[in-house]
């Protein structure tokens, strides 16, 4: 699965073992730079059979999570071989460091001051790493091996975000929980946001109103206060739309939010649609109103809003890899980009669409979230009732008695 992340001058994309930076400037127009991720370096002797078992399969994605820092200067990339790569945009995307992670990452984010990067993993832990050391240089490989454990869940973490001024760290997991913890003292839990009936896959923080939006495996989107109060909720798709899909899994994959127009976009697993909502505020509270449902050619890989509040949809389509939509106040909905009104976005879009050789590496690659996120329901009651009925009816099975042997008969006669 390919990813799409926006920074002030363009977009950072990942596909396979490579990154592609699409950068726009008035002098040079749109430029493209490809970066290949560094392979792990380990001088310790290892058993060849063990290496073969740990090697990722061809249908697994190599990049598991990416994040751009608030200013757009730094890019963090976590891969399937348990490495954290940091790049500096101001130094022409120079790699600052590559650090070894204890477990495979599921989500990564930066603090607001950009001094630290937080990595959530499959075992439910969040580790903190320094971006730059006190001397202004990236830390050496030996120093980078150490990491500060911030918090831990008893279930796989799926997303992590930080709130305004890094006051709280919010994490969500496979077991329907959203946890709001104080930062940096994350052992001090502020509250839980409980209400989802499936795994919680994506979080969005609204800075202006201090609200949290979550998307779950049951297909529901919920809006919360940071005190754990649920403001509103909505279902992504109705039953008719669900039945039209080939598969039953309709969990929310990714959420993206436009702060300027209060517009929320959501994509789901195994669904070729983008659901767009308008977040409205009134005296009675907060509400999510569906604005439009955008039909795509394929199931989207990723979505994001740029700094011009335009929605970018990345999909596995050779002739139309990325679609761009802009908000229309007249129609109160997202509409296809008008190239005359945004020549800059159109130039970037054309460059991305002409880079199918880069994106095709992700075609057919499954998302890093495993199919086992949904809990398997075990019907123990059926077996219990059957055994109970056997006891009531007196049909309880008894072990068969073996036929008496000659020695047994002789012993019985003597006695």
Task: Enumerate the language-model features and the residues they cover.
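Short coil/turn segments that connect the beta-strands within blades of beta-propeller domains
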Residues: 8-9, 71-73, 113-115, 165-167, ...
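Per-blade loop-tip surfaces of WD-repeat and WD-like beta-propellers in eukaryotic adaptors/scaffolds
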Residues: 23-32, 47-50, 81-98, 122-148, ...
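Intrinsically disordered, low-complexity acidic/Ser/Thr/Pro-rich linker and tail segments
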Residues: 1-65, 69, 354, 358-415
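Conserved strand-to-loop turn within each blade of WD40 beta-propeller repeats
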Residues: 15, 78-81, 120-123, 171-175, ...
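Terminal intrinsically disordered, low-complexity extensions flanking WD-repeat/beta-propeller proteins
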Residues: 231-415
């Amino acid at each position: 699965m390919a990813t799409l992340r926006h920074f002030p001058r363009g977009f950072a994309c990942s596909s396979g073992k490579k990154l592609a930076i699409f950068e726009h400037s008035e002098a040079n127009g749109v430029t493209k730079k490809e970066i290949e991720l560094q392979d792990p370096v380990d001088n310790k002797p290892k058993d060849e059979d063990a290496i073969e078992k740990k090697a990722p399969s061809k249908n697994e994605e190599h990049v598991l999570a990416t994040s751009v820092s608030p200013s757009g200067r730094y890019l963090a990339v976590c891969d399937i071989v348990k490495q954290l790569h940091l790049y500096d945009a101001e130094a022409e995307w120079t790699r600052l460091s590559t650090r070894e992670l204890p477990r495979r990452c599921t989500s990564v984010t930066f603090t607001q001051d950009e001094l630290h990067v937080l990595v959530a993993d499959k075992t439910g832990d969040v580790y903190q790493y320094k971006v730059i050391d006190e001397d202004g240089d990236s830390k050496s490989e030996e120093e980078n091996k150490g990491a500060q454990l911030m918090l831990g869940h008893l279930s796989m973490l799926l997303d992590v975000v930080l709130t305004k001024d890094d006051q709280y760290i919010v994490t969500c997991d496979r077991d329907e929980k959203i946890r709001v913890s104080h930062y940096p003292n994350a052992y001090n839990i502020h509250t839980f946001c409980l209400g989802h009936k499936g795994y919680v896959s994506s979080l969005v923080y609204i800075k202006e109103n201090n609200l949290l939006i979550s998307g779950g495996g049951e297909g529901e989107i919920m809006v919360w206060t940071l005190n754990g109060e649920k403001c509103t909720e909505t279902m992504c798709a109705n039953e008719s739309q669900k039945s039209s899909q080939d598969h039953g899994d309709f969990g929310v994959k990714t959420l993206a939010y436009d702060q300027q127009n209060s517009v929320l976009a959501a994509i789901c697993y195994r669904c070729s649609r983008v659901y767009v909502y308008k977040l409205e505020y009134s005296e009675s509270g907060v509400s999510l109103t569906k604005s439009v449902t955008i039909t795509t050619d394929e199931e989207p890989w990723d979505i994001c809003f740029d700094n011009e509040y335009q929605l970018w949809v990345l999909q596995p389509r050779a002739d139309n890899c990325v679609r761009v939509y802009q908000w229309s106040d007249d129609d109160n909905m997202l509409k296809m980009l008008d190239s005359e009104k945004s020549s800059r976005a159109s130039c970037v879009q054309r460059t991305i669409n002409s880079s199918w050789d880069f994106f095709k590496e992700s075609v057919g690659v499954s998302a890093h979230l495993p199919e086992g996120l949904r809990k398997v329901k075990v019907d123990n009651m059926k077996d219990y009732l059957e055994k109970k009925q056997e006891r009531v009816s007196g049909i309880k099975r008894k072990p068969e008695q073996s036929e008496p042997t000659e020695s047994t008969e002789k012993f019985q006669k003597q006695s």
